[in-house]
Each structure stands twice: as C-alpha cells, then as structure tokens.
Amino acid sequence: MAAPSRTTLMPPPFRLQLRLLILPILLLLRHDAVHAEPYSGGFGSSAVSSGGLGSVGIHIPGGGVGVITEARCPRVCSCTGLNVDCSHRGLTSVPRKISADVERLELQGNNLTVIYETDFQRLTKLRMLQLTDNQIHTIERNSFQDLVSLERLRLNNNRLKAIPENFVTSSASLLRLDISNNVITTVGRRVFKGAQSLRSLQLDNNQITCLDEHAFKGLVELEILTLNNNNLTSLPHNIFGGLGRLRALRLSDNPFACDCHLSWLSRFLRSATRLAPYTRCQSPSQLKGQNVADLHDQEFKCSGLTEHAPMECGAENSCPHPCRCADGIVDCREKSLTSVPVTLPDDTTELRLEQNFITELPPKSFSSFRRLRRIDLSNNNISRIAHDALSGLKQLTTLVLYGNKIKDLPSGVFKGLGSLQLLLLNANEISCIRKDAFRDLHSLSLLSLYDNNIQSLANGTFDAMKSIKTVHLAKNPFICDCNLRWLADYLHKNPIETSGARCESPKRMHRRRIESLREEKFKCSWDELRMKLSGECRMDSDCPAMCHCEGTTVDCTGRGLKEIPRDIPLHTTELLLNDNELGRISSDGLFGRLPHLVKLELKRNQLTGIEPNAFEGASHIQELQLGENKIKEISNKMFLGLHQLKTLNLYDNQISCVMPGSFEHLNSLTSLNLASNPFNCNCHLAWFAEWLRKKSLNGGAARCGAPSKVRDVQIKDLPHSEFKCSSENSEGCLGDGYCPPSCTCTGTVVRCSRNQLKEIPRGIPAETSELYLESNEIEQIHYERIRHLRSLTRLDLSNNQITILSNYTFANLTKLSTLIISYNKLQCLQRHALSGLNNLRVLSLHGNRISMLPEGSFEDLKSLTHIALGSNPLYCDCGLKWFSDWIKLDYVEPGIARCAEPEQMKDKLILSTPSSSFVCRGRVRNDILAKCNACFEQPCQNQAQCVALPQREYQCLCQPGYHGKHCEFMIDACYGNPCRNNATCTVLEEGRFSCQCAPGYTGARCETNIDDCLGEIKCQNNATCIDGVESYKCECQPGFSGEFCDTKIQFCSPEFNPCANGAKCMDHFTHYSCDCQAGFHGTNCTDNIDDCQNHMCQNGGTCVDGINDYQCRCPDDYTGKYCEGHNMISMMYPQTSPCQNHECKHGVCFQPNAQGSDYLCRCHPGYTGKWCEYLTSISFVHNNSFVELEPLRTRPEANVTIVFSSAEQNGILMYDGQDAHLAVELFNGRIRVSYDVGNHPVSTMYSFEMVADGKYHAVELLAIKKNFTLRVDRGLARSIINEGSNDYLKLTTPMFLGGLPVDPAQQAYKNWQIRNLTSFKGCMKEVWINHKLVDFGNAQRQQKITPGCALLEGEQQEEEDDEQDFMDETPHIKEEPVDPCLENKCRRGSRCVPNSNARDGYQCKCKHGQRGRYCDQGEGSTEPPTVTAASTCRKEQVREYYTENDCRSRQPLKYAKCVGGCGNQCCAAKIVRRRKVRMVCSNNRKYIKNLDIVRKCGCTKKCY
C-alpha cells in the first residue's frame, strides 16, 4: 500500500489559504469598482478587468525586493522601496536623476507647467505616474516615449489645452488615463494611438468641442469613457462602434444639438441602456432638456440650410487650422505656421505652405500623405531638413524650396523621388552639393540652384538626371579651378544652363561664363586643391573677409560684424569674435561644422540670446567666452553639445534666471563665471543654489540682484527657504516659444481676452503681430511690457480700467496700424503719448473720460484715417480749437465726438462746429485740470510744494520741519517713532516724548514683553519655553522638534541638513556633526577660516581673505603675489636724485625741476602735510568699521565739525558717553542727535535736511552746558535744551567715529541712545574737534577703515562724466642729462667716451691700428666702415584698453608708445605724465591705477 501523500497530512498551503481568504473581498471590490469607476479618483480605484483573479493587481513578492537607495533618491523627494514621492513640494520642474528602477512616481500638488521631452527619460520600469493638481499647460512631443511599462497616468486638474499626437504610443500596457478637469478643446485621431490595453479613459470637465471620428479607434479593451461636462454639440457617426467592452459611458452636461446628424446616438443609447444616462439635448428649443435616448428618429431633423453641411468634427474636418482645403489642394499660404501640418485630408495632392515661418522639416514630415504630387515651401525660414523628411513621396512631381535658409542637403534627402520633375532650391544658403544628391531623380527636367553659396560641384553630380532640360547655376561664387573643369565640358555637350553661371575666382577667371571657357583655363594651384572633396562637402574655406588668420586661429575681433561669417575654415581651433555687433547666435549648425574648434570668444557684442542646439555637434569646444553681452536668461538647451567644455564665461550680462538642467550635461565644466548678473532669486532658482554648492566651480560668483532682501548675496550661500515666489516676483525663465498664461498664441497672434488680467502679461513673444487684451481689468500700460513688440500691427485694449496714457508709451511700436483703447476710464492723454506711431491708421478712444487734449498730441499720426472720440466729456474751449482745425483737414473723425462743456458748447459736434466757437471765457475747473495733474487736487499740506510726476503721480516738497507723503507730519521728538512694538508716541515738550504701550508690553519705550512662560505650558522633553507676544514657543533639546518638541529629529535627512558649504552631514542619533570642506569651520561649516591671520603681504599690502586662500592687494608701485616687487622710484630716477632718500611718509616723491635738488611729496589719498604725515580723511566700508579717539572735552564747550559723504540712509557718525552721552547718527537719511547731560529724559532732535545723497555735507555740533546746537551745510541752526540739575556733559569714555565696538554698541542701543547698530558707510573728508583737524593716524584704535575718499570720489567722477578716461594728470619729467655721445661720429667700431674738454664733448677710442679724430683712418680693422643710422625713435599714438592681470580700463585710452631705433641705444620715454585711470575687473572689483602716459620720446642709453 502506498504511503499517504505528504500534502494530505499537512494543512492547505499558505498561498491557497490566502486566496480563500481574500476571494470574497475581491469580488466585493470588483462589484463596487464597476459602479464607482468613472468618478473615482486615485490610483487605488482602477477598474478590475474581467479576466479573473490574475488581473486584480495584487502582487505577493516572491523574490528580492527592489529598493531605491538614499543616494539615488532626489533630494527634495522621499523614497520607499521602488516608490518616489515628490508630491506637494512646490516643484517647478521634474527632479533630475530619478532612479531608472522607479515603479511609482508621485508629482501631484506641485507647480509644474511644462513636461519636457527629457523629464522621464530611461524610466522604462515606471508603472504609475501621478501628475494631478499642477499647472501643466504643455507636454512636449515624445515626453512619455520611454515609459514602456506605464499602466496608470493621471493628468487631471491641470491647464492642458491640447494633447500631443501619439503621446502614449510607447505605453502599450497603459490601463488607466485620466485627463479630466483641463481646458482641452479637441481630440485628434492619433492621440491615443498605441494604447491598445487602455481600459479607463477620463476626459470629463474639459472644453472639448471636436472629437475626431477615429479618436477611439483601436481601444478595443476600453471599459470606461467619460466625456461629460464638455462643449460637444455633435458626435461623429458611430464613434463608439469599436468599443465592444464599454460598460460605463458619460456624456451628460454637453450642449448637444439634436439634429439629423445625432439620430444615430439615440439608436445607440437605446441599444445599450446602461450607457450614458442623462444625455440631453440643448437645441433646438423644442427638444431642449429631452433625453437623447427617449427621442425617435423622426424627431432629429435638419433644416434645408444644414442638411448637407459637414458635421462639426466629421471626416472633412481633417483640414488643418487655419488652412483652406478644396479639390485635393490644401492652401496654407501666409498663415503664420511654424511647422508642417500633421493632419491633411486623405485626398490631398497639392500642399501650399509658402510665406510662413517654418524652420525645419523633421523626419518623415510627409510620410502619411503618399498621394502628394506638389509641395510648395518657398519663402519660409527652413534651415534644416532631416535626411528622411521626404521619404515615401513616390508620386511627388514638384518640390519648391526657394527663399529659405537651407545650408546643407543631407545625404539621401531626395532618395526615392523618382517621379520628381521640378526642383527649385534657389535663394538659399547652400554651400555644397554631395555627388550623389540627385542620384534617384531620373525624371527631373528643371533644377534651380540659383543664388546660393556653392563654390564647386563634383564630377558626376548631374549624371543620374537623364531627363534634365534646364539647370540654373548663376549667382554662386564658383571657384573655377581644375575641380570644375568637368562642368564646362558638360555644359558644352549639354547646353542646359540658361541663367549664365560665371566664375567668382581666381581673379583671372572673374565674371567669365563657365560654359564659354576652354578646358585648359581650369587650373589648380596648391591652395586651390581644397575644393577637391567638394562632392563630399568636405572642402575648406579661405580666411573670411575682414578677419585675420594665423595658423589655426581666426581673429575677427572689432570688425563691426552683425553676423558670424559663414566661411570659417574647417581647420580652425580658435575663433575670436569679440567687440562686434552680433545680436543672436542661431541654431544653424555652424559650430557643428568646425570639428577642431576648441576656443570660442564672443565677448562685448550685443548678444541677447542663443537659440536651442546652437552648439550641437561642437563637441570639442573647451572654452566659451560670452562676457559683457545682453543675455537675459539661460535655457536648458542653450549649451547642448558642449560635452568637453571646461571654461564658460557669462560675466556682466543681464541674466536673471536659469532653467533647470541648463548645465547638467556639461560634465567637464571646471570654471563658470556668472558675476555681475541681476539674478532674480525666487522659487524658480532654488535648484541652482543646490547645484552650485554641489559643483564648487571656479570663476566669478553668481549673486542675487532681486529681491532687495537678498541683493548681493551669493546664490550658493542662500538657504533653500529664502528662494520664494510672490505675486510680484514669480516669473521664471520664459524660453523660446513661450506663451503667457491665460493667453493663447497662434502663429504671431496673441489673445489674452476676458481673463480678468490686472496688468499686461510679461513675456509676450517679440514677434507678435496682433495682441488682444480686451475685456480685462488692466489699469496701467507698462511700457516695459510692450516696448519689445516692434512687429506689432494691432493692439486691442478696449473694456479695461486704464486711466492715463503717459508720454512715449507706444514709441517703439512703429509698425502699429490699429490701436483700440475704447471703453476704459481714460481721463488723461499726455502730449507725447502717441509719439512714434507713424503708421497708425485707426485710433479708437471712444467711451472714456477725456476732457482735454494737449495741442500736438496727434502730430506723429501721419497715416491716420480714422479716429473715434465719441462718448467723452470734451471741454470745448480755446484749448481744443487746434483739434477742431485738425480733424477738418482730412475728416478723420466721423462726426460723433461732441462737446460736454462749457454750457454754451454742450452737445455740439466738433466736426461741424466752426473753430471760431472754441473760445476761453473763464478759468477751467480744478476737477478737469486734475485729470492729468493731481496737484490741482491740492494733496500737499502745511504749505508744501506739489510737483507733478508721470502716471498722474505727484511729490510733495515739504517745508522745513515737516515730512510724510503729504507733509502731514512734523519733525519732532517722535520722528521715526522711537517707541517700540507699535506703541503710540506723544510729544511732551521740545525734544521730549512719552510712549503709550500696546497690550502686552511695558517699559519706557514699551520695550518689555510680558512673560507668557510663567503660566501653564506644553513644552515636552525638557524643552525651554521662549516668551513671545501673548504667546510662547518651545526651544527643543538637541534631537527633538515640533511645536512642543514632541518629535524626534531625523538628522542629516533632506528636511534637516544644516551643514553648509558642501560639508558632509553625519548622524550620531542624539546629535549630528559636519565634516567641513577645506577653508571652513564651525558647527555647521558656515565660518570661513580667516587665512589672513598669518599672511605674508609685504610693503603695506592689504590681505583679502578667500576660501582656503588669500590675496595681497598691493599699494601703488608694488607688484607680486606678496607685493614683494620693489618701488619703482629707484629705477625712475638716477642714483643722484634727491628722491632716492626722500622723507615722504605716505606719498610719492616728485621733482618739479629736473635739474634742481628740491622735491615735493605727492600724498596718497587721505594724507596731508609736507611729508604726507597726517591721515585726515578716511572711508568706512564695513558694517563694523570705527575709529577710537580720546574722550571729548566738553568744558567750556564741545565743538565738532564733520565733513562727510554717504549714500546710505543709516549709520553712526559719532558717539561718546555711557548713561550721559552725545550720539550723532544718520537715521532715514537725516541727522539724528541724542543729547543727555544726565537730566532725564533724554533730548532728541533731527535735521530738516536730507544728507544721504552721496554729496559732501558739513555738520556742525556745538554743546555748551545743557544746550546743544545743530547746523547742516551752514544753514539754519537749531537747538535743544536737556533741562535738569546737571550743567555739563561729563565724558570719560573713548569717543568713537563712524561706528562702535560690539559691547558699547549693544549697550547704547539697549538704552535707546542710537536707533541702529550699523557703522557709517561713506567718507569723512575732514573732522575738526574743538577747532583742531583730527589726525586719524594718531587714533587709539582703527578698525576696517581705508585712507582717503578715492573710491567715493572715483564713483562721483564716473557719474559726472562717463566719457572721461583720466581723472587727473601730473607732469613727470625724467631726469635725463644730455648725452654727448647721443649723435657721435665715431667710425669703424670705435667707442665714444664723454669728455667735457673735447670740442664735441666726447672722444672716440680707436681700435688697434686706427687713427683720426673719428677713427676713420689707418689700418688694423677688418670691419667694413660703419655709419651710425639716423635715429628713427618716434612717438606713436594708440587708442586701446589698458589691461592688467584680469582687469582693464573702463574706456579705451588715448596714449602713446615709443617705437623705432636709436642705433645701439634705446628709444624710450623722455617726458611722461601720471594719470589716474579707473579699472574694472572680471570679478566686478574696481580700483584706480596710476599710469604713466608718454608725452615725449627720445634716444637714451638707459634701457629700462
């Protein structure tokens, strides 16, 4: 007997138990899913197929479980297993470097706007993609092509306007697709192609008006389809015919027109009673509200007018918008198309696309339209044709491509076009024709290559064209060398060239007709052999005209070029294009055709942008210089192809934003200079800070230009939390092809109508020709939003809230022909508001509030034919007489405009009323005058003067003693509100005040907050309670977080990583530590190690700290890394000069008389005195700068005068004291004085004058006992009295100028003696204390001050005269005694020796055997007689930039060089003048250089 089976003795296997347990649950879930699916939301509610348990979607893993490690998880996301959750993170772009193993990706609840082609590359295992609740309006082609495993895709609750064709073609496994709650209007026939497994498709809550009849073709597995709440009026016949498994269909809430075209739907719904309930008619009126399924066929009627009309989305509707289709011809001429249409009627045989803006023919552009016989693409902007763009067109007979920008014909582009008879390629930029280009064109009879850049043609190019009858080759720069000999022979035998093709070069052949030349004329010299490979498009070019070529370097610097030359030699390694007028780098493949190019310089041009893929193929470029241009943004396709780029310089452009991924592919980049760019540090730039920290590149640092809170802060140092977007600062990079939100862009027409816009959108495309902004809420026309629209011809701003047209608002819109501003609140038209509109033909200002028109307002409107001014309350006095005369000249006003005032002119037509009736009989009312000038409303108070400003703004110029927008406040002790915490300040008497505290505060200044930690608190885990304003917060112990410190912190996670400057965070469970990079230290590696503590700078050089390094900033005349280079005086003067042992302390020795023994000292900035021994003027440039002096003597009086200059609103000028004190500071641009001799309360006063304007001001301070007097710029003196028992201010502490040390500053601030802790920033030119000029060199202590005001004065000079190169000049005469041997006559190699007793002042020392006065006689020398050459030493004027290290002068300098010869002596400067030159460095540092300018040259023996 067999042993019993092991399975009969054991309980059922676990897998079987599990199935028995969950089977009832699954059946229940299936029942619920079937009924709830169309309206369910999340991935968890997908339909369960009828294929049984195997398709339920529950997976019990039986092997290893994949996990995405932390290193492969995007920093802003969280990863669990193979799931990546990036939801609700405020993202503006899809995170980079998502693991290729991810199966579920959640991106819902972010701020994504565009899905780019590269966003989901390599994610071949992705099964679920969640993109709901974003702002997505565009999906690029092929964005989902790598998602071959995708099962569920949610795109609902976005702003999609259209769905790309074939966008899920690669996703054959897709089960569920949700695109509901968007703004989609049409669904084309190829949208869902390839999604044969799709079971659930949700398209509800869109704006769909058109469904292609084949839209759902092939979706044989579809079970659920929702189309409810759209704008469908009809449906193509039998559109649901192939959906045999459909079990849920929603069509409700659509405005169906129940005519004869919809009768099929009624029959369909009656046969499938469970589908599409509540589908009702909207029209005609007798059927409105009726259920479609309840109607009989005879009730669906069509009127005679519509019986034969095509259905709204019928088969005929495949005609592409906005083209016209008839009889097999698709006419798309002049429709502003930018690409070839993707849909055409099936019977199309002729396609007309001329005069559009098409730029390329992509692969297989016409492969679906095999019936095409004629294609016209003339007069477009086509520069690129894919090699298979014309594949499949076997019936094509005519191809017209003239008037484009084609530069290259790819190999095989005409392959298979055996029926082609006419090929027009004239008026392009074709430079070469491959030998096999026309190989398949056996039927071609006419070929035009007229007007291109072809230099040669390879033998055999025309061999395959057996039917050719006419060829046009003229207007090409043919090089008639031996390589073109065959063409002359060919044209002799086949006289088919009828355009008169001629030679361009060589010179002997210039302008000679090719067909008339004999074969022996076609010769090749060595350099002309470069055309030998023309048939392979590998010929090389000569050096471009206007450029200089040396070796492999092509230098086109400073040639005034407006575009890059096309004939750059192929062997070029360095291309220099600096200092030209290039405006934009085109994506025309130029750099990709230079295989050896390593260095490209484009500095100091007018570049505003670089087209995407402009550098594609330029894989060997290592250095790219783009500094000092006008580039405004960096796109993510700008530098594609630069795989070996190491150095990228974008210094001094106008870059405000960088698109994510812009530098991602620059793997070799080591140096990136982004200094001097106005980066907008909002939420769109947060990724860039992280990228910069990670890369640690060399070069100028990128700094924020906005918002003001973070201005000048290095981007990489800014924490992620500081990158914020607000309503005023939310704009990111717009990029090419951008269309503003709430607008639709079709070609060059932009429509932004009826969108409740408050202002004109930013980023309107520059090529816009028509702009519609009507029916919004725009109140003001921002000039900067429209000034770039130079192609605009029509602008509609009607039905808005505009109140004023300011001067020169439309000055740049020179092509504008129609301007509509009707039905606004326009009350003021300024004199030059319409200046520049020379081509304006129609102007509508109808329905506004205009009363007056300035004379000459319409003088630029030379082309005007119609003006509408009706329904305006025009005031018809003598001020409008000019308008009456003007409209009667050409009758451009149709007789609608009427007068509203004055009474005698009321309701009279301006056109028909005689001009003599327009007279002035009294003063115009203020309410009318105030429409353009708000000052007539008298807004200013206290006798202030009102000054009118643009946009009907105004400014009140206050009388002394008042301030505020309307001068409504007095300048008294309460100026600037000295009370804290929103307390109310009340003046007690002159100079004294009291504070009434808000609830929760106490103290003299309401500075003390009531301690809320004394009551019951909820802080946990030994947290410390921190008092707030009627609240408290818990300060947690290390390792805890949360409002009440009840959460354990996960150290070193993306949410908590305080380590800065590239430091590595290490988690120790209870705490963390940071492993700092070199050059940093501190708990979070935030402190830069001061490398200047042990610096080696010599000769007074200033140490400048860096990152793990320092630099020495040398004084004048010293050079070297450590300023170790010697002073130049010893070389500038002979050893006998008095300057050799001068006594100048802080200056340069100067001899006014070269022959004398006296000298003067020219002092360095800030120093005075005979020997420059006194430091009397200093600059303060740091927040903690100050000077410490001895205590101020106050008996019998204290008198302090400070001459200073500052552009900062706040800063400490002087301070001395403790409780009793004298404090003087800048506060809100005025001088604030706090004076207390010990009599409480303190006395305070403010200057009436504003002094923070960058100009020099003198403030005089006089303290006599209790009295204190202030006078500014010798104006009116004002006084206060600190009344009380004490008479004198007793001071024993040091006096500080320009700032305070930390401890005294905190104490003074705490005691309300000063209003801010900021040091003075500016220059103190002179300081007098008790009638003595202060020598700061004797100060007890100095901290971070700079001698003199040179920097400030340099900036002032720059503002006053930007064109002036030099700041001053000082004659310098080099001491050079006359050399008697300078023009000696010694011969035959003899030596000249000075001798004062000789007749000529010198003596000739002859060689052996020579004699004579000049050694010109005798024997003994085998040397031939020599003659001293006449001196050719001369001064040569030049004008160029002066450069030094990485710096240069601001302007080209006019100076001279000594050139020529002096025999055996040197040609050098005899007289020089020293001038100060402003220098600017690449890192934005500025300084002043003392430069010796040559004034006279001569010969000298001293060659140095």
From Swiss-Prot:
The keyword Endoplasmic reticulum does not apply. InterPro entries: ConA-like_dom_sf (IPR013320), Cys-rich_flank_reg_C (IPR000483), Cys_knot_C (IPR006207), EGF-like_Ca-bd_dom (IPR001881), EGF-like_CS (IPR013032), EGF-like_dom (IPR000742), EGF-type_Asp/Asn_hydroxyl_site (IPR000152), EGF_Ca-bd_CS (IPR018097). Keywords: Developmental protein, Differentiation, Disulfide bond, EGF-like domain, Glycoprotein, Leucine-rich repeat, Neurogenesis, Repeat, Secreted, Signal. GO terms for biological process: axon guidance; axon midline choice point recognition; dendrite morphogenesis; digestive tract mesoderm development; embryonic heart tube development; epithelial cell migration, open tracheal system; glial cell migration; gonad development. Residues 1-36 form the signal peptide. Residues 64-100, 310-346, 534-570, 730-766 form the LRRNT domain. GO terms for molecular function: calcium ion binding; heparin binding; Roundabout binding. Residues 254-304, 476-526, 677-727, 872-922 form the LRRCT domain. Residues 1176-1349 form the Laminin G-like domain. Residues 931-968, 970-1007, 1009-1046, 1048-1086, 1088-1124, 1135-1173, 1377-1416 form the EGF-like domain. Transmembrane segments: none annotated. GO terms for cellular component: axon; cell surface; extracellular region; plasma membrane; Slit-Robo signaling complex. Disruption phenotype: Flies lacking sli exhibit disruption of the developing midline cells and the commissural axon pathways. Disulfide bonds join 543-549, 547-556, 657-733, 681-704, 683-725, 935-946, 940-956, 958-967, 974-985, 979-995, 997-1006, 1013-1025, 1019-1034, 1036-1045, 1052-1065, 1059-1074, 1076-1085, 1092-1103, 1097-1112, 1114-1123, 1139-1149, 1144-1161, 1163-1172, 1323-1349, 1381-1392, 1386-1404, 1406-1415, 1433-1467, 1447-1481, 1458-1497, 1462-1499. It is found in: Secreted. LRR repeats lie at residues 101-122, 125-146, 149-170, 173-194, 197-218, 221-242, 347-368, 371-392, 395-416, 419-440, 443-464, 571-592, 596-617, 620-641, 644-665, 767-788, 791-812, 815-836, 839-860. In embryos, highest expression occurs around the midline glia and low expression is observed around CNS axons lateral to the midline. Expression can be seen on the commissural axons traversing the glial cells but it is absent from the cell bodies of these neurons. Residues 1433-1504 form the CTCK domain. The record marks 1135-1136 as: Cleavage. Glycans are attached at residues 111, 231, 381, 459, 807, 812, 982, 1022, 1084, 1183, 1199, 1267, 1316. Its main location: secreted. A short-range repellent, controlling axon crossing of the midline and a long-range chemorepellent, controlling mesoderm migration and patterning away from the midline. May interact with extracellular matrix molecules. Repulsive ligand for the guidance receptor roundabout (robo) and prevents inappropriate midline crossing by Robo-expressing axons. Interacts with robo. This is Protein slit. The lineage of its organism: Eukaryota, Metazoa, Ecdysozoa, Arthropoda, Hexapoda.
